[in-house]
Amino acid sequence: MNVRPATNEDTNDIFWLLMEMAKENTSREVSVSGTVDEIRRVTGMGGCIVAEKDATIVASAGISPQSPWFTDEVFLGDSWFYVHPDHRVSDAAAKMKKSLQQFAKNAGKDLVLAVHSTDNAERKNKFFARDMELM
């Protein structure tokens, strides 16, 4: 599994991956333009990564500066963190998390990753909490 920074050329593949994520997590209509804009925004900031297997993007994560309403502190938080179901037994998630941790460390920011679905939420929380500070 190869994890690398995303480029604008990856936008289409990331978009379709996020459509899979949306199918799993919401019944709401997904905004095509909003999704593409978010992918491009995060990619342009250098905060989007992809995991590839055999030259196919099978996972992606996007982080950007965020701040909760209760503090002025800025951290790097995820807009998405998704591994295609066919690749969830791979090391894609672990490699992406490690890559994002290094990105945040280099930026001098804390990294906050959230669980965006209720499916297997406890397992996902444990994965994100492992070797990361919880907020």
Annotated model-derived regions:
Residues 112-124:
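Conserved beta-strand-loop-alpha-helix junction that forms the acyl-donor binding cleft
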